Amino acid sequence: MKKTALITGFTGQVGSQMADFLLENTDYEVIGMMRWQESMENTYHLNDRINKKDRISIFYADLNDYSSIQKLFETKRPDVIFHLAAQSYPKTSFDIPIETLQTNIIGTANILENIRLLKAKDDYDPVVHVCSSSEVYGRAKVGIKLNEETPFHGASPYSISKIGTDYLGRFYGEAYGIKTFITRMGTHSGPRRSDVFFESTVAKQIALIEAGLQDPIIKVGNLSSVRTFQDVRDAIRAYYLLSLESAKGKVPCGEAFNIAGEEAFKLPEVIDILLGFSTRKDIKVEQDKERLRAIDADYQMFDNTKIKSYINWKPEIPARKMFEDLLNHWRDEIKKGNIPLNR
């Protein structure tokens, strides 16, 4: 019998790429969880398959609505859950801290509690990927590579919410034997990356300038950060491989893993790389105070040793290729008439 995979956050960048990966590389039946009001711009290419029920379907539910999550698990019983849904924008979390905490912590608890109850009732035993974030490490010391034992130091309401999510994944694994594993992904990007994130807003603005829709000035926030970057498609491959090992019982319940790129950049270097792909050579950069966070994680470098000891994985897509694909994504969106907001 074919396995069923549930993807929460199906319409987001990571969720939509996860659906693509599973449909192309497995025989899984895929269930995409989404809210009624969500945009499907990242999943338009799957609509025909969804309409034909060709190995993919949609289930409407909301992380904050326990009854809809309960109905989802009672009726579908997925074999593997990739829990990717979240309020995932650190800067936005300063504006809506309560909603961020509610969605990310209580929403995750709603999923795990439903699984716990079904496991106690009739031995329901799925694999559960709980997506945390490298933001849990917050303001790390310069020169230190972050590993899974590095203390948490939340630097935004978002990062604090992900600390809670991380602990929930570990607790439900250790206390109830649910096959949870937690991932702390470093900065990831590529096609479909939301423009609220640094490299994507830079790429979007370049595409707008090339199309004559914006003056040749890129507006940015903090430029002092040093980050590793990886292509989201590399991260998704790691998620899938970890889920296979978890299903075999080779990943301890509640285990956490860093997943990060191995190419580090200062943010001005990211701008220079993207500008190098542009057809315009007159673009200037201007700092915008409205884009600054109250506090930021300025330095993040990672140690991937642990995950490599569990699965045969390493980042394969070069960061420069990822940045070029991101810029081309925005060029394509603008050509289609999908003019984004200035943010």
Residues covered by each model-derived region:
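Residue-level signal for the nucleotide or nucleotide-sugar donor/cofactor binding architecture
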Residues: 64, 95, 103-106, 149, ...
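Amphipathic terminal alpha-helices
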Residues: 3-4, 13, 25, 319-343
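Mid/C-terminal beta-alpha module of Rossmann-like enzyme folds, strongest
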Residues: 202, 245-292, 304
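NAD(P)-dependent short-chain dehydrogenase/reductase
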Residues: 142-144, 167-243, 262-267, 271-277
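Core catalytic loop region at the nicotinamide-binding pocket of NAD(P)H-dependent oxidoreductases
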Residues: 213-218, 242-259, 334-341
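Non-catalytic, hydrophobic alpha-helical segments
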Residues: 235, 239, 259, 270, ...
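N-terminal Rossmann-like NAD(P)+-binding domain of SDR-like oxidoreductases, especially those catalyzing
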Residues: 1-188, 329
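Conserved C-terminal active-site "lid" loop/helix of NAD(P)H-dependent oxidoreductases
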Residues: 45, 232, 256, 290-314
